[in-house]
From Swiss-Prot:
Oligomer and partners: Homodimer.
Cofactor: Mg(2+)
GO cellular component labels: cytosol
Protein name per Swiss-Prot or TrEMBL: Anthranilate phosphoribosyltransferase
Gene: trpD
Amino acid sequence: MLNKIIERENLSFEESYELFNMLLNESEMRIAAYLVALQTKGVTADEIAGFAKAMRDNAVKIDLGEVTDTCGTGGDGSKTINVSTAVSIILSCFTKVAKHGNVSITSKSGSANVYEALGCKIPETPDDAKKSMEKTNFAFLFAPKYHPTLKKIMPVRNELKVKTIFNILGPLANPANPKYQILGVNSAELSENVAIALSKVGGIKKALVVYGNGLDELTPNGTSKITEYDGKFDTYEVTPKDFGLDYSKIRPCESPDESAKRLIDVFSGKINDDRNFILMNAAGALYTSEIASDFLDGVEIAKEAIESGKVLKKLEEIRNV
């Protein structure tokens, strides 16, 4: 199959599923060759879906009921606060959230890094995650614990330090099989393909796949592209004005500790650029989860949760599990 990819021929869903399982038994050199060849060719919806389905089928199983996930693909090389972690905590004030995350590969603050910097403990086992969900409406699913078959592939990804199909796969391979999902991608071209792949993997009722002018988030300082899936596909663009928010700057972030501190500042009611960034993405997640009727409603719901102290209280609950 490597020659086929090098010749820029696309793989079918079935071939992609087979290739994923084959990579688990390949040498690191050949794994790197496949990953770079796929990335150079450009991945299709079928290839993403085939890999994602195989990744889910190889994962440690966990049943948390009907959950939402907020996750980005990473790989945008940005130095921003970890917005998806902030959003997941806000969202858990209203619905069950299974946050599928990992340590950083290309950014300054991966979700697992920031989660621990917030003083939260990553559940060791699926049973621990279930207890966390029962007590707090929130469970952090640390990807390496649920995808042990990828141990051989992770060192290759770390060594390559470039975007690969695995950056895309993480959000599609949540072992809790989320029914609702807001998923950030690292290029505009990916939004439709990832939305199609998500629908093919199965289990999704509603999803937003977002790209924000260089970020795998909705951006507060420009135009964002969204592909929405709710049984049908719709692609459109939004700006902060569609959320009732002013344009704001994206301030760089240099470490998980800094990210955690700035998240807590927002949760504590501080009004700054970070707040707009978080509110915009929280609104997207609340709309995706069918808690908010639209983005404007989502912003108001998120604001109230922060201003009433619900979000800080929720963070404290999660810390104390």
